[in-house]
Amino acid sequence: METIFAQSSSFGKAGVAVFRVSGTKSLEVLKLLTGKSNFKPRFMYYQKLTSPESNDLIDNAMVVYFKAPNSFTGEDVVEIHTHGSKAISIMLTNALLNIPGVRLAEAGEFTKRAFLNNKFDLTAAEGIADLINAETIMQHKQAIRQAGGALEELYNSWRSQLLRIISLLEAYIDFPDEDIPESVLKDVTNTHKTLINTISEYLNDNRKGELLRSGLKLAIIGPPNAGKSSLLNFLMRRDIAIVSNIAGTTRDIIEGHLDIGGYPIILQDTAGIRGESNDVIEQEGIKRAIDSAKKADIKIVMFDAETLDSAVNEDITGLIDENTIVIINKIDLIPENRIFNIENKYRCLKVSIKNNIALPSILKNIEEIAENMAGFTETPYITNERHRHHLKQALVYLKDFNLDNDLVLATEDIRMTMRRIGAITGIIDVEEILGEIFKNFCIGK
C-alpha cells in the first residue's frame, strides 16, 4: 500500500497541529524531514523540520514513530506535532507531497487501514466516526461503547451460535451412518428458536440508538400568539425567532439544536395552527407545521391561557400523544386557581415564558421523554440503518430454516443468516460497502 498522510487536527490557527503518516515509507519520511536516522519507537523527539527539496526550515516540532503492528493503523506510523499555523501546515503538506510514494490520504483512510489490519471491526470503526461527531454526553456514551467493541461482541455471540448449529448439522450430513444422539437436533432447534426471539426483540427497539445518534426532533406547535417563538428563544438561550403580537408572524419552520440532559434535541418552531386564515403563505406554513408535528419524536403543544378555550381544535389535539407536553402559557394573566377543560384530559404544565414562571419544568419533562425514548440499557442499541438492514435479512433466513426440509438446504439458511451478521462486523468480504462507511470520516482519521 502507498504511504499516506494528512493533517489530523483542524486546519487553521491553534496551539498545535498534528500530522499523521502511515505506510511502509513513514520512517523514511521522518528521516527526510529531520535529517536524523535513529528513532526509537514510541519515544517523542524534539526536531527541526526542513523541506527535503529546498532545505527551508518549516518548524521546530515534536515527532514520534510507531512501528508496525503496534500503531493505530497496524502499519508504520509517524505523528508530527507542529505549531498550529496555516503557513506551517501548507509548507509541511507541500514537503510531504514532494516525497515520491507519498500521497494525501482520503477521508477515513487511516481508520479503513486499521480495519483491514484487524485492529477492530466495522461496528467499532463506525463507533469511532460517531465519537468524533458526538455533541452530547449521551451520544458520546453510546459511541464510545460501540467503539470499544460492545456491538461486535453482541453480534459475534450470535454468529458463534449459528456456527455451532452449522457444525452440528454438517455432522449429520457428512456422517449419516454414525450414531449421533437425537439430542443434537433438539439442541439445534432450541438454539434456533432462541436466536429468532432474541434478534426479533432486538429489532423491536423503537430505533432508540438511531434517535440518539441523529437527534430527537421536537416540534413546538399550537395556535398563533401562544408563545411558541418565545419558548424556542428561551430554550435556545438566544433570539432566533421573531416574537410579535401579530398572528402569523412565524410562517416557516425555524430550527435549533439543543443539549437537554445529554440528549441531542432538534427544536422546530412552527407556524400557528388556525383554520380561518385566508393568507396562502400562512396556510402553507400551517400545513408544514402539522407535517412537522407528525414526523416529530417529541411535541410541545402550547396554548395562551387567555384564549385557550377558543383555540383548542381537533387539528391541534389530534396531534397529542404519549410523547407530547401540553403547556398553558401566560398564566400570570389569569386567576391563580383557574382550571381549564383541557386539564381534565391531558397533563398540562402552567408557565409564563415572559416572567420565567415554572420554566425548569419544561426542560425536566423534555429530558424525561428523551430518556424514555433513547435512554441507555445494558444491551447496546442498533445505531445504524446498515445494521438494521442486515439483521432483518438475517431474520428472514433464520425463519426460513426448517429441519423438516432437506438438511443441506436448512444448513444453507443458517449459513446465509451468519453471512448477514458477518456483513455488519466485516467478517465476510464487504469491500463494496467499505467506501460508503469510511467516506463519512474526516480527512486524517
Curated annotation (Swiss-Prot):
Binding annotation for Mg(2+): S229, T250
Known partners and oligomeric status: Homodimer. Heterotetramer of two MnmE and two MnmG subunits.
SUPFAM superfamilies assigned to the protein according to its UniProt record, in alphabetical order: P-loop containing nucleoside triphosphate hydrolases, TrmE connector domain
A single GO BP: tRNA methylation
Leading EC class: hydrolase
Cofactor note: Binds 1 potassium ion per subunit.
Domain TrmE-type G: 215-371
Predominant localisation class: cytoplasm
Binding-site list for (6S)-5-formyl-5,6,7,8-tetrahydrofolate: R20, E79, K119, K445
Pfam family, one: TrmE_N
EC number: 3.6.-.-
Protein name (Swiss-Prot/TrEMBL): tRNA modification GTPase MnmE
Binding residues for GTP: 225-230, 244-250, 269-272
Source organism per UniProt: Rickettsia bellii (strain RML369-C)
Function: Exhibits a very high intrinsic GTPase hydrolysis rate. Involved in the addition of a carboxymethylaminomethyl (cmnm) group at the wobble position (U34) of certain tRNAs, forming tRNA-cmnm(5)s(2)U34.
Family per similarity comment: Belongs to the TRAFAC class TrmE-Era-EngA-EngB-Septin-like GTPase superfamily. TrmE GTPase family.
Binding-site residues for K(+), renumbered to this chain: N225, S244, I246, T249
UniProt keywords, alphabetically: Cytoplasm, GTP-binding, Hydrolase, Magnesium, Metal-binding, Nucleotide-binding, Potassium, tRNA processing
Domain of life: Bacteria
